[in-house]
Amino acid sequence: MIFDSRITPIRRDLASAAYKAIVKRKKYVNAKLATVKSAFSPLYSNKGSKLSTQLLYGEECDVFETKNGWSWIQSRRDNYVGYTPSIHLTRKTYKPNSKVISLRTVIYTKPDIKGVTKGYLSFNSLVEVIKIKGKYSLIKNLGWCPSLDLVKVKSSKFNHIDLSKQYLDTPYLWGGRDSMGIDCSGLIQNLHQINNRPFPRDTDMQEIFVTNEVKYEKDLKAGDLVFWKGHVATVSYTHLTLPTKA
């Protein structure tokens, strides 16, 4: 049986206990839940390999192994599997009730734009707001951010063409999903996830996932996706919008 290693937690020596009846391995592991506590957590197919993707703040993952500062995980949001530095994860649990709708929001130590900054969170990050004071929201175990940068986690029906314009001039980063660097399929995934639509990570997965094929170019509509080898773009009105510069 052939599995896609990008989304299947099976290695030569170890596998998720969920696959015990399917594959034979030396060791089977019951996953432990963790949450990303950094602005993003890079994910690699192997330690030292090129970047595969990134998990954003607040996203949950299943941890199958933690060793020498690395964790072998599977994202619960898109099922991607890989190695990430353990320092980016926490076993603390959250109940996300909001998400970041702006390209980037700054985190402050107090509800004051003149306050000390602690970092940032990117579009599509998931947060638990525990208090609102004036124009600011307090994110659990993190700090304050402008409330205008957040929407309720169940909010949807956003125009992803308009949202994609926030990324204009964002650097291209292979495997990126963060606002500091992103690739084409990462952007498309973020735009669908912000509308609470499950969406796979890579272009080949996305092309299979999108079932309605447009036969003629004249039939393309705003918001349609166009695929070619290794790339994806979205149609903006009558023009093709390339998400990032490669």
Residue locations for each model-derived region?
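Boundary regions of SH3-family modules and the immediately adjacent low-complexity/disordered segments
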Residues: 1-28, 75-101, 140-163
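SH3/SH3-like beta-barrel superfamily modules
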Residues: 3, 54-84, 119-148
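Beta-loop motif signature
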Residues: 23, 35-57, 101-129
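Short, well-ordered loop/turn sites that connect or cap secondary structure elements
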Residues: 55, 121, 219-220, 226-227
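Surface-exposed beta-loop interaction hotspot
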Residues: 103-105, 109-115, 119, 123-172
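Catalytic cysteine-centered active-site loop
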Residues: 172-222
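Catalytic nucleophile-His microenvironment captured as a short glycine-rich beta-strand/loop
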Residues: 230-237
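Single conserved hydrophobic/aromatic residue that forms the stacking wall/gate
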Residues: 239-246
